Design a protein with these regions (language model features):
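Non-catalytic terminal accessory segments
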Residues: 1-152, 404
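Canonical alpha-helical transmembrane segment with a positive-inside/aromatic-interface signature
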Residues: 125-171, 175-177, 183-188
C-alpha cells in the first residue's frame, strides 16, 4: 500500500460531538446503579411473599449487602489509580453477576409471578419460592454460559459487502476486522495467540483493528498484545485508536502497534492498489481523543482524506459507529467500527442504542455510505457475553463491474 501521511491535530472545539443522552445518564449511574442492582434482587428473592427461616433471610440479606458494598470498592481499587488486577476481576465479576440477577429478578419477578397467579398455582408463598429458584437457576446457567462465550475464540462472521464505486480489480478483496480485544486484568495471552491464528487462516488482503486494544497501559498489557505481531495480510495491517486507549496512555498503544508492524492510521490514509484499481484506506482517532488533552490527537476526517482522489472509493476505520454521520457527509463508501460489543450482556443493548446509531452488523446511512459494526472480539469488564457473541469478521468487498466470483 502507498502511505500518504496527513496526520493533523484535531479540529476546533466546535467540532466536538455533543454530549449524548447516555453520557448524561451515566453521570448519575455510579450512585444509583449499585443500590438498584443489589437491592432489587434481594427484595424479590428474599422479601416478597416468602417466609424463609430467619437464618436464611439474614444470611441472604447480608450476602447482598456485601455485594453492594464490595462491588464499588473493588471497582475503585481495580480501575482507579492503584490498578489492582485482582480487585478489578472481583469488581467486574460482581458487576456482571448483579446485572444478570437484577435483569432476571425483574423479568421473572413480574412475568413468572403473574403467570403463576393466573394459572392459580399454589399459594402466594409457593409462587414466590418458585420465582426465587427460577431466578437463581436462570442466573447460574447464564453466568456459566456467558463466561464460556466470553473466553472462547470468536466465531468467524462472513459477509459480502457490495460497493458501487469499487473497481473490478478489487472485487473479492478480503478484509478481516478485529476490534475491542480489551486485553485486561484476566491474562488472555493464549487467547490472543489463538485469535491471531484464526485470523491467519482467512488469507486476508487487509486486516483492521478498530481500537480498544486493552484496558491498561501498553507496558502493562504488552504480553497479551504481542501476538498481534504475528497477524499476516497480503496488503497490510491497519489500526485506529478507541476510547479505552485514551484512558491508558494512548500514545503508548500507537507506538506498540507500530512496533508490531501495524499501520496506525491517525487521521491519515493509505492507498491499496490491486488489478489496476485503487481503494483509499483511511482512519481517524477516536472521537474521545478530542477531549483527552493529548497533543495532536483528535478525530479529523478532513485530514485523513487530504490528498485522496475524491473519485476513489474509501474504506474508513473509526472506532465508534456514531462517527458515521461525519462519514456520510464526506461521502465515505464503507465505515468499519466496533465499540458497542453488541450490548455484551443482554439487555444492555437498549442503553447502547441511546448512544450509537447501530448496534451490530451492516447498515445504510446515506445513499453511498455503509457502516459495519462489529460486536467485538473480546469483552470489556465483566467476563460474560450473553446473547451478544463475539466475532472475527471477514468482509469480502464486491464490485458491480464484473460477476461475483465464487
Amino acid at each position: 500500500m502507498t502511505d500518504t501521511d496527513n496526520t493533523r491535530p484535531a479540529e476546533g472545539a466546535a467540532q466536538a460531538p455533543r454530549q449524548s443522552r447516555l453520557h448524561r445518564l451515566m453521570g448519575y449511574l455510579p450512585l444509583i446503579a449499585p443500590v438498584l442492582l443489589w437491592a432489587v434482587p434481594c427484595w424479590v428473592l428474599l422479601h416478597t411473599g416468602q417466609h424463609w427461616p430467619l437464618p436464611v433471610t439474614l444470611a441472604g440479606t447480608a450476602l447482598f449487602a456485601l455485594g453492594l458494598v464490595g462491588m464499588p470498592l473493588a471497582m475503585v481499587r481495580g480501575h482507579g489509580r492503584r490498578q489492582q488486577d485482582r480487585a478489578a476481576i472481583v469488581g467486574d465479576t460482581l458487576l456482571g453477576t448483579s446485572w444478570i440477577l437484577f435483569t432476571w429478578a425483574v423479568l421473572l419477578g413480574v412475568l413468572l409471578r403473574l403467570a403463576l397467579t393466573v394459572a392459580d398455582v399454589g399459594e402466594s408463598q409457593d409462587r414466590a419460592r418458585i420465582v426465587t429458584w427460577a431466578v437463581l437457576g436462570v442466573t447460574a446457567i447464564l453466568l456459566a454460559w456467558g463466561y464460556a462465550e466470553a473466553r472462547r475464540v470468536p466465531r468467524v462472521r462472513r459477509l459480502d459487502v457490495h460497493l458501487p464505486r469499487l473497481g473490478a480489480g478489487l472485487d473479492g478483496l478480503r478484509v478481516v476486522l478485529i476490534t475491542d480485544t480489551h486485553y485486561g486484568p484476566l491474562d488472555r495471552a493464549r487467547w490472543s495467540a489463538r485469535v491471531c491464528e484464526t485470523v491467519n487462516t482467512l488469507n486476508a488482503d487487509l486486516v483492521c483493528h478498530t481500537g480498544d486494544i486493552a484496558d491498561g497501559t501498553a507496558e502493562r498489557r504488552r504480553a497479551q498484545a504481542v501476538p498481534l505481531g504475528t497477524v499476516r495480510a497480503a496488503h497490510g495491517r491497519v489500526y485506529v485508536t478507541g476510547n479505552h486507549e485514551y484512558y491508558s496512555e494512548a500514545q503508548g498503544w500507537v507506538d506498540l502497534m507500530d512496533e508490531l508492524g501495524w499501520e496506525p492510521l491517525r487521521n491519515r490514509h493509505l492507498l491499496l492498489e490491486r488489478g489496476g484499481d485503487t481503494l483509499v484506506i483511511a482512519g481517524v482517532d477516536d472521537v474521545t481523543a478530542e477531549s483527552s488533552g493529548l497533543a495532536g490527537h483528535g478525530a479529523h476526517l478532513t485530514g485523513a482524506l487530504d490528498g485522496a482522489d475524491p473519485d476513489l472509493p474509501v474504506l474508513l476505520l473509526a472506532h465508534q459507529p456514531t462517527f458515521v454521520d461525519r462519514a456520510a457527509a464526506a461521502g465515505i463508501d464503507l465505515q468499519l467500527s466496533g465499540h458497542t460489543h453488541g450490548g455484551q450482556i443482554w439487555p444492555f443493548h437498549h442503553l447502547v442504542r441511546l448512544d450509537q446509531p447501530a448496534l451490530a452488523g451492516l447498515s445504510h446511512h446515506a445513499p453511498r455510505t455503509l457502516l459495519y459494526t462489529s460486536r467485538g472480539t473480546g469483552f470489556w469488564g465483566p467476563p460474560f457475553r450473553i446473547f451478544a457473541p463475539s466475532e472475527i469478521t471477514l468482509l469480502t468487498l464486491r464490485s458491480p463491474h464484473l460477476p461475483t466470483s465464487p
